[in-house]
């Protein structure tokens, strides 16, 4: 699944979309914690491997998306046309390496990251309203902040790794924008 839009741009934009679970799925918090390991800040796998170790990009991220009944894991990187092929390869490899599991240390950082983001989002009326509206649409009810925090904290390393083994991220839709050839 590949879409290429060739345009004269300063950078090549790379987007990946992997099927994922939505908030109604029992594995939702395991998936969100795995995503936080992948892209939750400067100690995340994407930041460390794609930006710090290899210097392929300035910006790289992954985030949840989707509609009712179908979640998505989206990944993004912006790079030069000369490095687009390698960047795409490394970005895919890091997402797909999640199937090997995460460590206790990574999970601990991910839990802190998600709970911190939850607290920060609660500080914004707009963010909380959007979260409540999304919950109503996706779940038919609004989750309390304490419910979300308890679900994050209650998700074990075994649960995350079992989820990742059962739901490996493979065969993404790939979108490329820029001056790309044979990527």
Kindly label every feature range from the protein language model.
Residues 61, 65-121:
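M16/insulysin-pitrilysin zinc metalloprotease superfamily fold
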């Amino acid at each position: 699944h590949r879409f290429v839009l060739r345009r004269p741009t300063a950078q090549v934009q790379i987007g990946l979309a992997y099927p994922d679970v939505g908030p109604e799925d029992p594995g939702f918090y395991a998936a969100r914690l795995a995503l936080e390991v992948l892209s939750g800040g400067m100690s995340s796998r994407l930041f460390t491997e794609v930006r710090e170790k290899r210097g392929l990009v300035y910006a790289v991220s992954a985030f949840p998306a989707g509609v009712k009944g179908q979640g998505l894991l989206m990944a993004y990187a912006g790079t030069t046309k000369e490095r687009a092929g390698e960047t795409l390869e490394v970005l895919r490899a890091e997402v797909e390496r999640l199937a090997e599991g995460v460590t206790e240390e990574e999970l601990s950082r991910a839990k802190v990251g998600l709970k911190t983001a939850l607290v920060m989002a609660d500080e914004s009326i707009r963010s909380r309203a959007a979260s409540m509206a999304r919950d109503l649409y996706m779940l038919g009810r609004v989750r309390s902040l304490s419910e979300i925090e308890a679900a994050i904290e209650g998700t074990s390393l075994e649960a995350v790794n079992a989820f990742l083994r059962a739901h490996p991220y493979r065969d993404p839709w790939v979108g490329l924008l820029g001056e790309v050839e044979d990527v």
